[in-house]
Structures are given as structure tokens and as C-alpha cells.
């Protein structure tokens, strides 16, 4: 099975937490697209809803929300994900991934959209001990 590093952001506090997702937790993310809301129970966060906001593969190639599929493509881009133009009108061909989470992703970025009963700090404080 695959393993993911999930970077979970808390919009209320501005803090982020790292979750090592393996097994059922990783399976809950496979095939999902950026912007999809996922249940937090596989990550030990019952009652929470998590929205996938992005990710990157083993080479560091970022996932682009507006690119369908899960493969890597070379796109001619002028600005946005994975490229910042230094000159006016500059365009460059850069590798980008599709918006579907695949097995060769290493990191998945997400944020909390619906909060459960137990505070986030308690959930991750117990995991740190």
C-alpha cells in the first residue's frame, strides 16, 4: 500500500499538523481530487471534515487543481502553481501533476472545513506523546 505525508492546516489558528497516512488512511485519499471533502475518521479525527487543497509527488512536482487526471504533464505556463515569472510576459514549460491523488504522491495538503467535538490541539497532543 502507499504512504502519504498529510499536511493538515487549521484555518482558525493558522497552525499546521503533519499526519503520516498509511493503510486505510492513505486509501481514503487515493483517487480523490483537489477540492474534495474527505471524512477525518481514518486520520483519527472523528467528526471532522477535511478538504484536499494540493500535493506533490516524489520529485516535488506540484499538483494543479485545474488539470484533470493523475499524470505528469509539461505545460507552458505564465504564472501560478510551480512558477513565478521574473520578466513581464515570460512563459516557461514546467512539469505539473493532475488534480487526482495517485500512488506516487508523497505529500498531500489539506485543511479542516468542519470541526468535531474534540479540539485539534488535544488530538495532536495525544499523538505527540
Curated annotation (Swiss-Prot):
GO-annotated biological processes: translation
Pfam entry (one): Ribosomal_S6e
Keywords: Ribonucleoprotein, Ribosomal protein
Origin: domain of life: Archaea
Any one Gene Ontology cellular component term annotated for this protein: ribonucleoprotein complex
Entry's Gene Ontology molecular function annotations: structural constituent of ribosome
InterPro entries the UniProt entry points to: Ribosomal_eS6, Ribosomal_eS6_arc
SMART domains for the chain: Ribosomal_S6e
Family statement drawn from the similarity comment of this UniProt entry: Belongs to the eukaryotic ribosomal protein eS6 family.
Name under which the protein is recorded: Small ribosomal subunit protein eS6
Gene: rps6e
Amino acid at each position: 500500500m502507499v504512504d502519504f505525508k498529510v499536511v493538515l492546516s487549521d484555518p482558525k489558528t493558522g497552525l499546521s499538523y503533519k499526519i503520516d497516512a498509511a493503510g486505510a488512511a492513505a486509501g481514503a485519499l487515493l483517487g480523490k481530487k483537489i477540492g474534495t471533502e474527505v471524512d477525518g475518521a481514518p486520520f483519527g479525527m472523528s467528526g471532522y471534515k477535511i478538504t484536499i487543497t494540493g500535493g506533490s509527488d516524489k520529485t516535488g512536482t506540484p499538483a494543479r487543481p485545474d488539470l484533470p487526471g493523475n499524470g505528469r504533464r509539461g505545460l507552458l505556463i505564465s504564472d501560478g502553481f510551480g512558477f513565478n515569472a521574473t520578466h513581464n510576459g515570460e512563459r516557461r514549460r514546467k512539469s505539473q501533476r493532475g488534480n487526482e491523488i495517485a500512488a506516487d504522491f508523497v505529500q498531500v495538503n489539506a485543511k479542516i472545513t468542519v470541526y468535531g467535538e474534540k479540539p485539534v490541539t488535544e488530538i495532536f497532543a495525544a499523538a505527540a506523546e
